[in-house]
Amino acid sequence: MSVKESLSLLNSMQGNVKIGNVEPAKGNEGYVDNAGYVDCTKSYFEATKSLKEEQLVCDPKFTLLDSISAFEIMEPKMDSGIDYQPLRVDFSRDLSYLEILALMDLIVSAEKEWHYGSPLSESLLCSAHVFSICKSPISQVGDSGFSSGSGRNTTDIVLFPFVLAVIKCCDIVHREFLMGNLYDEEDISSFSYHMSFLQNYPIEKLNYLLQSSIEYLASEVIKFSAELRQIIEGILNRIQLRIGILRVYERSDIKTTIDALHLIKNLVPEIQNTVSVVDSSIKESILKQYWDFRVQAQLVATAPVRNIPPTGIEHSYQRILYFADDMLLILNSHTLASSLAVYQFCLDFTRLNRTPEPYVRSSLQALITANNAVNLRDQPTSYMLECIREFSGLPSNFYNPNTRTVIEKNSISSAYGPLVESLIAHSTNIMVDLVRICSHNPCRFRRNLINLLPEITVAHFEAEALDLKFVAKSLPSNGPFSSFIYHVKLNAIEHILLSSFEQKLHQPYQWPHFFAVLDHVFSIHQTHLELHGKDRNTPPMAKTFVTYLHRILNAIKETYSGYLLLTVLCMRLNIIKTPSFTLDEKIQESYYMAHYRPLINLRQPKPLLRSEADCIIKNLQNFSTDDLIIKSNEKFTAAKNSLINVIKSGFEQNEFINPYFLQTNYLKNLLCCCITNLVSLAILSKDHSANLKIVEIPGNPLPSLSRT
């Protein structure tokens, strides 16, 4: 439509324009209705009359690129800009202590929502105090406070440093993305909004302001009644908590970080007890005066609206406790006494019953791979060779465990010297990559594992060839290289499968195929560990560890075997429904290839073809309902007993695994699933039509059969 046609249409509409659900009264320019819409009819038509034919409407701050980007992501600003009225905030007004306390809690809640995936435009930037600092150039952010006057009020002394500290914490997280230590949502970057995160603001000045706030509040608290004193002490605790979080984010040294984390764990329960001091009316008043939920209309570019439900202030502080627990957990990794323990620790870190926030995951990567070393101790090559030595042993004339180096190259036969160098280089990259990607979010972790699988396959071929060379030289015949690389390969396949289930990539009617494939891989891995543990050439300490891994794998395998029977039973009883369109042969083949394509073309382990999986499922379907219930009950009972035995016994060889063994938490969650299923199977054995369904229990890795 041309500009001339547009003007004609606008003129024909004049006098009948309706803004929102309100018919604007003539001469009522600037009227704001209950929904927050502003009557701009008169100004709008005056502006359109000034247009000429073929003239483009543009604004120097809104470029063509911005408009295209906004259109592509369905930017709400395209619709909200014309009716948006910026929030007018009087920053010179001195807030009461109760209002400051409420604002602190709301800002912390918004900060945690950002850490867990909400866009800045729906979380932190909605705070007028945060927004006012972020949109100002760093050169204009001093230390005087929010108000422009010469005098500093309580809000400037107390709330201003707190807000600065929150933004500075976000800046530190933001820098982790810029350095490539994290890969999550793009809009985590403040650059997307052309705003500042106080990148160059001196942290020394910030510490001084926070300390001044504490001294000011300490002098004020003695002046007031017990009720107001409780509020001021609550503010003091929140400032001290922010100092502790800032210390953790700085990563100065391990002792300082651990002390700060213990401070956080002590302060959060006290703060949680004072959250209820602020009633709902105060919160609503604060939100109305200092919170702009439509702030995206002021931003140059924003991420698509996600409308992630707010978690609430109480849960936000619970998330801070999670943060402290997770950080203490990864700091334990520096106490691990062996290279194989580091590898196992990182794998187990991916099995936490919640996804740690981004900074925790980047801290794990920073701690494990800092200074081009693994766990601040081994160079990458020696780390990889130590893993092999601890798992299956290495020939004494090949590797020196005292110096952690390969023997001199001139003593390695020229027949397989290049093969040794190729395998060491290849395997080293794989092991370091595995440690690194364990810190990624679950979706990226799975994708990176799939990308790494071909590299592991090549390394496995090289390891087999090298082991044959050693056999020809009358060296140990248990294949030390190929045994360990094959173990790593099976670990990768298992985590690819398990993470696909955790991310709900399989529909319930596809679960039998999934559990059949997983059971097949577990069986191969179980056999590999069993044979390796019995090999006479495996060192005694390695045998102990491999035997323990075998017991863990056996307990996990029995659990998932029980789920294979359980899903077939649920489909029989119509607890899991099968859509009719999925019965088509081509659709079934397409589903199978989509889920298991990375595994289909592997030579080792031999993949489970769809025809073989169908045969396994069909054999189970031939059982009667009662037989399926009995067999499921037997499997889950065996799994429960195995899990209890492994959890109780633990692993006593601290040379390999430290007392904080993450695997135990995962096994406990599997045990909960087994017990829940056993209770439901007992109900089904008495009444096949019992009202049961598959439910997901928070924290458990698998859904369970339970009452509706």
From Swiss-Prot:
It is found in: Cytoplasm; Nucleus. One of its GO terms (cellular component) is cytosol. InterPro entries: Naa35/Mak10. One of its GO terms (biological process) is protein maturation. Pfam families: Mak10. Keywords: Cytoplasm, Nucleus. The keyword Cytoplasm applies. Component of the NatC N-terminal acetyltransferase. PANTHER family: GLUCOSE REPRESSIBLE PROTEIN MAK10, N-ALPHA-ACETYLTRANSFERASE 35, NATC AUXILIARY SUBUNIT. Belongs to the MAK10 family. This is N-alpha-acetyltransferase 35, NatC auxiliary subunit. It comes from Schizosaccharomyces pombe (strain 972 / ATCC 24843). The gene is mak10.
